[in-house]
Amino acid sequence: MHSTIKVNAEREGPLTLLKESSHNAPYKVIHYGSRHLHEHLELIMMSASPGIMDGDEIDIEVNVHENAQLKLFTQSFNRLHPMEKGAVQRTNVLVKKGGIYKFIPHPITPFANSIFRTVNEIQLDETANLIWGDIIASGRVHSGESFQFSRLHSITKVYSGKKLVLYDNQLLEPGRQPFDSILFYERYTHQATLMYVSPYAAELKAELDEILTTQYEEFTFGFTQCAPNAVMIRAMGNEGVMLYDWLSAMGQLCWEFTVHKQEEEQAKLDAEQTTEPKAEEKTAPVAEKQTKQKTAKRAKKEATAKSTAKKAKAIPVQPVGEELEEELAEAVAEK
Amino acid sequence: MQPLLTLLQINDSMFPIGSFTHSYGLESYVSQGIVHDTPSAKVYANNMLRHSIYYNDAAFLQKAWALLEEKKSVREFQKLDELITALKAPAEIRDASKKLAIRFLKLTQELHPIKRCSNYLAKIQEGKLHGHYAVAFAMYAHGSGITLKDALLAFYYNTLNGIVTNCAKLVPIGQGDAQKILFDLQATIKQLVDEQESMDEEMVGLCCIGQEIRCMQHEKQYSRLYIS
């Protein structure tokens, strides 16, 4: 069965709205809770089918337009049923200038003999922000079905300003790899990855260096600056729900951080525009009051945030507002 | 220039490019007690060759070689360089590849300059390319009249030599046991080299999840001897 899901998130004033979205059976994309609850957009992807069946083809397209903010949720674990031919999912994401897109789906659970190929192509503007997660279980672990699937290939390519910045190539083929061995899952049954691609990534990494100082008993994790503008967290554990909750909390932290940073920059821009530029200020000369000028300036500002972020890495304590510090602490405590 | 002698020299573990300062995650495995004796060191070495090196550095070497054979444009090398950079997620592993590439290129240029290598080094130093050791090695070996098969055999051998030497120092395992692992995996290396060229495009850069996590954890390891 061939299904398509299309989502367009557009910014109108302070709000992000859902425009020109479409989906067909068994999928449905609806507002997650009341649409009036947030200024950003929250959607949930639902399915009337018990999972992905043999021969299924799913095409997902998500467009996050300029400065739009979208969180896309899933309803439940993505179950891959026993197959002969296999199923394919293709996802294309586009995040434009200043946009934020967060997608951390529930774990993929591959049943015995399932064959699945998922390809994610993500195009980001250099000022766009991506919070992207994926969790793969070894199977229906509690039913004693672990690594009984045939093949699971997950390819994720992230481009920032047309340049390939991240390429995650995960092939899980129980006949090919020794999963219970060194280099692979060791004694674990689940793997999780979170990518944060953003002009603020280096600054977030410095925050994580302060926050994620000890390992947990239930799972093992590592994090790294995987590109100048990207941070990656990877984990292995035995509980899908626990990894999902933790990854969601970390994703929420990335979201709050991004929004806070953007607001900070916007406030600075607004202040610059209302006050006369002083001679000693090193900022570029303020041009005529044109509305278009604002967006151009913002883009420039965001581009330079990259170099600022690089420098910031050397500073041990980040100048972050108390409010955000509290939010970060809460997000971690929620775990 | 003698191809075999050149290969022996540039591939020597004592070739001073700093490869002995990297453990590529092994130090984490040892400190966490996962690699703790000769049998587990052998499993680690075997898995590294078959599941990490084969799909990554050796595959990058082979891809660079193919571009050299086909006399591809600079743009194609830039794409390969970007691909490798995007695949090497753990920062220490990415940096290791760059540092080794720079030192390898600088040193080999003093021995016998090869134009492509000097161009690659210049691009890395200008910040236009990231720089990766496997590509640098392929360029110099190709320019020195070495065959792809020999270059690959030597590359696997030296990678494995680095692994067993690190195991001997870190785990530790006996020098004799280390040499036994090196010898016993000859057939594996031969098989991987024979299959290298037929690798499907989508298999290049396959990730070993546990290995990546351990490499990331190394950044936070309290006491450490190695850079990666």
Model-derived features with residue positions:
Chain A
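Conserved beta-strand/loop scaffold segments within soluble protein domains that form the structured core
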Residues: 1-206
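A structural signal for the main folded, soluble domain(s) of proteins
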Residues: 138, 151, 319, 326-335
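Intrinsically disordered, polybasic Lys/Arg-rich low-complexity tracts
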Residues: 274-319
